Every structure is written in structure tokens, then in C-alpha cells.
């Protein structure tokens, strides 16, 4: 099992295995993470388990149907799951150990921070990934 937590350690979780990792450059993710790019690990729902602190989580609807979750104590963004996706999205920096996956692609590159240069050879998508429809266009996800 691979464990993770928020900065203060109140919200804790573990996963059996990660499915993928994505770099998201959308404005929402940049503002919510206070970084030029957000990195998410995606895990199948049945491979994710809360270990503690669920009662210490606040939610914010960052776009219609997309709820971001934060630790009430330290403010760290914590794992969240959109009802229309089969996975839980976890900010990669929350893991205590290597989640065992590496980034596979960039999404929303059309809104990337002007000071951020993409220097790798991973696929870049100006908006959303081609294999998902517009109904989930506001959520960072890769398969």
C-alpha cells in the first residue's frame, strides 16, 4: 500500500495501485494548487481508502460538478472524485512514497502559465484529452 497525507497529517489515505499521472495547466488547477502546473495521480475508486481525517475536509465547487477538497487545518488540497469519473484524483505531492507512475500527458496547455515552459516530450492537449467528451472537460484526468 502507498500512503499519503495533507501537510499537517490530519487527512490520510492509502492506495493499492495508481492508474496514471497527468499534468494539468488549466487556470482552476493552477490557482487551487498555487503552482504553474498541477500534477495528479489517478486511482481506481476500489484501490483508494481513507485512513483518517475525512471529517476535516471542506469542499469547493471549482466548476460545475467538479468539487475540490481541502484539509480544514492546513489548507492542503486532498484527494477528490468527480461523480462522473471512475477514478479518484490525488494531488501528487501528497504521497509519502513513490506512487509508481510517471506523467503521461499534459492537458489544458492552451491556458498554461506564460512563464512555464514544457520541456518534455509528453503528448500535449490544448484543452481536454481526445478520448473523453466535453462533459468532463473541467477535471484533470488521464487514462
Regions found by a protein language model. Name each.
Residues 1-143:
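A short Gly-Trp-Pro
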Amino acid at each position: 500500500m502507498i500512503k499519503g497525507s495533507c501537510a499537517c497529517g490530519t487527512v490520510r489515505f492509502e492506495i493499492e495501485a495508481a492508474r496514471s499521472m497527468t499534468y494539468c495547466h488549466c487556470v482552476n488547477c493552477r490557482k487551487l494548487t498555487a503552482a504553474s502546473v498541477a500534477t495528479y495521480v489517478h486511482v481506481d475508486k476500489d484501490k483508494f481508502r481513507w485512513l483518517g481525517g475525512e471529517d476535516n475536509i471542506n469542499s469547493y465547487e471549482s466548476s460545475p460538478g467538479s468539487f475540490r477538497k481541502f484539509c480544514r487545518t492546513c489548507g492542503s488540497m486532498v484527494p477528490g472524485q468527480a461523480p462522473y469519473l471512475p477514478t479518484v484524483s490525488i494531488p501528487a505531492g501528497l504521497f509519502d512514497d513513490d506512487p509508481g507512475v510517471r506523467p503521461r500527458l499534459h492537458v489544458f496547455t492552451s491556458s498554461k502559465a506564460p512563464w512555464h515552459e514544457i520541456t518534455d516530450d509528453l503528448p500535449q492537449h490544448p484543452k481536454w484529452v481526445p478520448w473523453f467528451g466535453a462533459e468532463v472537460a473541467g477535471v484533470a484526468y488521464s487514462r
